[in-house]
Amino acid sequence: MPDEKPTTAAPKKSKSAVFLQRLISTVVLWAIIIAAMFSGNAVSDWCFLGIMLALTWAGLMEFYDMTEKRGLRVFRQWGIFGGLLLIGSTFFYLAMGLGANVGIAPAKAGDFETSIIVIWALGLCLLQIKHFKDKDAFTAICTTFFGLIYVAWLLNFIQKINYFPQIDDSGPYYVLYFILVTKFSDLGGYCAGSLFGRHKACPNISPGKTWEGFTGAVVISMAASVVFVHFLQHKMHGMKIVHAVILGAILGLAAIIGDLIESVFKRGSGVKDSGSYFPGIGGILDLLDSLLFNAPLMYLYLRHILTD
């Protein structure tokens, strides 16, 4: 028999190569999304809706994939339907004027959103009654419901920022602002951790995360926030430099928490990335993890402080 050549493992990419891949993927993806938001023509709203629906669908697919890898039963189709229904109905309520007759105030938009979730949740319970299995009844409902909240409900705050009724045309600028500040937090944390990281922060969850990286993430997000507001303050209703400093710190910290929460899900499911769509990033949830918790924080700050 001929000698078999020993197989060699693929060489591990350097940190600089991974960083470059991550940077290129992030810039290209968010440039497409932002271009759709600022296209300034009749189809821009529909492009925005299409992107939101695509992110919701892919994010829920990945989340339910991870839960099923843990052996948990989930109503996948109903969960995805609920996520798309929530995003689509909120869009028509805010952007297409379905809420105009009652006044599109933030509280009323929240009531509308809650109504959709309640109706969907009742349908989820009926599904469980129809397909009852004693051992997994509780987990099937809870896991399906949590997927809707974690992906679709949190992501829906981006729409509520974009179409916030009390800030004239500032909504897209606030969406752009919180996305850029959050992503600079991610990149700042990665760079600081790679260059200066010595002290592990959460070795059981994400061994690569360090306290130096966390510090860099917050510092860079604050700097990015101040620079953005300095140049575009005239486009952002109610925003001042002091708010930029505070929001930069809040969004930087929340981005870290969002990243760690997704790491908990991935480690619990035994996967490295939630998907493999984007070089250097992974899946949709790897792209969105730090944004999911920052979207509601940005909305709440906008509603209760900047426009109060």
Describe each PLM feature range.
Residues 249-257, 284-292:
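Hydrophobic transmembrane alpha-helical segments of multi-pass transport and channel proteins
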Residues 182-194, 254-267:
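Short helical (or helix-break) motifs at transmembrane helix termini and adjacent helical loops
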Residues 268-290:
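Interfacial loop-to-transmembrane junctions
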Residues 265-266, 289-298:
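C-terminal transmembrane helix pair
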Residues 221-222, 287, 294, 303:
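Hydrophobic transmembrane alpha-helices of multi-pass small-molecule transporters
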Residues 23, 63, 187, 260-263, ...:
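Generic detector of well-ordered alpha-helical packing
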Residues 301-308:
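Juxtamembrane boundary at the C-terminal end of a transmembrane helix
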Residues 2-249:
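Membrane-embedded alpha-helical bundles of polytopic integral membrane proteins
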